[in-house]
């Protein structure tokens, strides 16, 4: 068989294990998969990576707020933030904004605030908001491509951003 690519839908350490074994077995078909977790990709190493992936956030984003977050985080910890660090930071930021604007920590008041369409700076080009019917955070995601080894600056520099999805002219509901 000569597939165009191999799609994997694994998370966490299962990604790392798969990527390393895929390399060990000498398989060369391009890879693609569900949401890329940055830390398992760093653990697998650039030699075990290939293909296109989905990402919620990547430290290579160039929005001013992402650049500032990455710079501050990297300065404090010595490596760039991964997508989990971004998620933790953004969740705390959203909650602080909601508490400040409602002047309350009451769950019902916070839910009402979120359901009325409040928008949040989530370190991306587009703001995020919560959908009323299921409280899903509506946000853009990214297609990332594993970098050519010759272009990699360090072990953290593994991907390049291809595009944001959905496009700026499209509703965030498109991918939710």
Where are these regions (language model features)?
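Extracytosolic ligand-binding ectodomains
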Residues: 1-176
